[in-house]
Amino acid sequence: MSETFEKRQLYGGAIEIDIPRRFIDVTSYRHIPDHQELFSDEKSDQSVIIELNEFQDHISNANAIKHHYEVLVEDAGISTDKSVILNFRELTQAEMPNFDASIPKYVLLAQQKIAKFNETAENTINIYMALVRLEKSKTDLLITFNEAIALAPTSSSVAVVQNLTPSNDQSKSEQLFLTMLKSFKIKDYSLFVHN
């Protein structure tokens, strides 16, 4: 079954991205920080997060994506033995064609064991993270796709997730993420004006 994508307007229309239609805008029912946009699909336990973060000028381009991932892990309170970076690489111009080739772009795949909300049951999650370094705009732009690949039997996700296949087709998930990245476009750079 192929995905049906829908163009989503972010940050008041300043950015657009194609996201699968099955994902809903979480801001319609939950408060999300102003620097983030969040979409989720409860039935697959997948989510997409777009974040505008301060440019980390003290970190090299090659290490910046690892830095942002480590901040995510630390903020979530995940111990280092429950999180691993599987690989990371530079994105090609063809993978993010709406950005000049001179703009540094990276992608990372990691895996975490993490409990939802206040639960103790830990699910195994694949994290696909992309970083676009907008030095002139003083912004590190993150796009993250989270996908549960194994659910603990007592996790609250078990009751709502449909058809989670333990074998997990990682290449299909990676292709889904790359399709989103290919569509990602900044339409109005005044979004990044700092006072």
Swiss-Prot record:
GO terms assigned for molecular function: guanyl-nucleotide exchange factor activity; small GTPase binding
UniProt entry tagged with the keyword Transport: yes
Iron is among the record's keywords: no
Assigned GO CC terms: cytosol; nucleus
InterPro entries: Mog1, Mog1/PsbP_a/b/a-sand
Gene Ontology biological process terms in this record: protein transport
Family to which this protein belongs: Belongs to the MOG1 family.
PANTHER family: RAN GUANINE NUCLEOTIDE RELEASE FACTOR
Name of the protein in its database record: Probable ran guanine nucleotide release factor
Species per Swiss-Prot/TrEMBL record: Dictyostelium discoideum (Social amoeba)
Lineage start: Eukaryota, Amoebozoa, Evosea, Eumycetozoa, Dictyostelia
Gene designation per UniProt: mog1
